[in-house]
């Protein structure tokens, strides 16, 4: 039968924020998104607005901006992605909406991923199939009479976020075609040291989703979104895996159980913390439960540029919160503490120093749901 909700691509990342203008200024400074289209939504622009099937009258405003893809590196270890990333920042104002609910529960964070555009007939088929599996629609709304937005309630199934499906009207309009009420341009409102910033974003290598039970979650990604193959690893502080591991500036012994997959034009890393203190448990799951913890946006191959980036970010209030050397030191990762600046998630960076030993780079095993299905 295929995926319950077939994915086209990553259309946008939905982030609930407390202060729209302040957030856009930090996105400009850190990620280089200077231009933002701002829209105000209330009963005038919203029609047939439902929350859990009940009529509601919310108001909120949004700012939509897109990263600029950096020049393609010819370095042999450079990442393959070259995809602009669109962020829709949402500041809830009044009334009931999925954004207001998220604000009440989490404050700020990645609330939804827009992954599909379907016509009305196709979406009704999708809705019925989802309902048969106990997955409902958290909210729906028609914008300017031209685009219907449906927020599928995948929070329990996939790990704390909604999946948005858009249904264009007869004219085929998408959200970006709707007129903005304002355009904000933050270029020239910040300064950076020479030779650093903004953080080069060539795409979303993966969304890091923290969950309680990895093995229970992965089959649902296959059933709902059609994710077929996962590389499974048990990351722990020991030679060849996590070396020089640190958390909040101190050495740390910890472990986490992960499944990683490239998917569509992005990817997922689903993470179950299993031992010791980490940002995943102490500052995320213990406080908020499951959800999108981070985005891998920055892949570097220049150790000097890597160090400059960390110093620059620390100087503007975005310290490195956790990290380690990986695979015998061939690679390193770190998390930049963008929680307050960007709105409830952190950004991952990866440094590729050299090609790792194939034995160290290999996962513990793969789970291939396509092969399992074919063998039945």
Question: Which role fits each region the language model picked out?
Answer:
Residues 37-42, 91-94, 98-104, 174-179, ...:
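Short, tandemly repeated low-complexity microdomains enriched for cysteine and small residues
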Residues 2-4, 10-18, 62-85, 88, 100-122, 124-199, ...:
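Vicinal oxygen chelate
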Residues 1-21, 108-115, 177-215, 224-226, ...:
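N-terminal beta-strand motif that seeds the catalytic metal site of vicinal oxygen chelate
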Residues 4, 53, 104, 198, ...:
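Short consensus segments that form the blades of beta-propeller domains
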Residues 83-87, 91-148:
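Ordered, small/hydrophobic-rich secondary-structure cores
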Residues 59, 107-109, 146, 159, ...:
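A short, structural micro-pattern
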Residues 5-7, 16-84, 125-144, 210-264, ...:
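Core segments of cupin and vicinal oxygen chelate
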């Amino acid at each position: 039968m295929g995926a319950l909700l077939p994915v086209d691509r990553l259309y946008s990342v939905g982030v609930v924020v407390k202060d729209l203008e302040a957030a856009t200024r930090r996105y400009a400074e850190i990620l280089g998104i200077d231009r933002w289209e701002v829209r105000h939504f209330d009963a005038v622009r919203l029609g047939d607005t439902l929350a859990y099937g009940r009529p509601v009258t919310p108001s909120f405003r949004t700012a939509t901006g897109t990263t600029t893809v950096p020049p393609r590196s010819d370095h042999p270890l450079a990442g393959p992605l070259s995809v602009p990333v669109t962020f829709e920042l949402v500041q809830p104002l009044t009334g009931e909406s999925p954004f207001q609910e998220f604000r009440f529960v989490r404050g700020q964070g990645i609330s939804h991923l827009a992954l599909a555009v379907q016509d009305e007939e196709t979406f009704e088929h999708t809705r019925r199939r989802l309902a048969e599996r106990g997955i409902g629609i958290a909210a729906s709304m028609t914008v300017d009479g031209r685009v219907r937005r449906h927020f599928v309630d995948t929070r329990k199934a996939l790990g704390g976020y909604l999946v948005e499906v858009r249904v264009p009207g007869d004219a085929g309009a998408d959200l970006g075609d709707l007129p903005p009420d304002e355009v904000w341009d933050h270029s020239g409102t910040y300064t950076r040291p020479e030779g650093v910033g903004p953080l080069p974003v060539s795409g979303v290598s993966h969304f890091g989703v923290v969950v309680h039970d990895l093995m229970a979650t992965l089959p649902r990604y296959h059933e709902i979104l059609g994710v077929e193959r996962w590389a499974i690893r048990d990351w722990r502080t020991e030679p060849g895996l996590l070396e020089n591991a640190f958390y909040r500036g101190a050495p740390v012994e910890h472990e986490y159980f992960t499944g990683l997959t490239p998917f569509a034009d992005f990817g997922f890393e689903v993470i179950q913390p299993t031992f010791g203190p980490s940002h995943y448990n102490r500052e995320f799951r213990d406080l908020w439960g499951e959800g999108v913890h981070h985005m891998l946006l920055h892949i570097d191959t220049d150790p000097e540029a890597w160090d400059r980036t960390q110093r620059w970010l620390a100087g503007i209030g975005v310290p490195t919160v956790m990290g380690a050397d990986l695979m015998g030191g061939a690679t390193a990762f770190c998390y930049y503490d963008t929680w307050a600046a960007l709105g409830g998630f952190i950004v991952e960076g990866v440094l590729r120093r050299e090609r790792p030993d194939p034995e160290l780079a290999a996962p513990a095993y793969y789970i291939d749901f396509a092969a399992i299905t074919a063998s039945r």
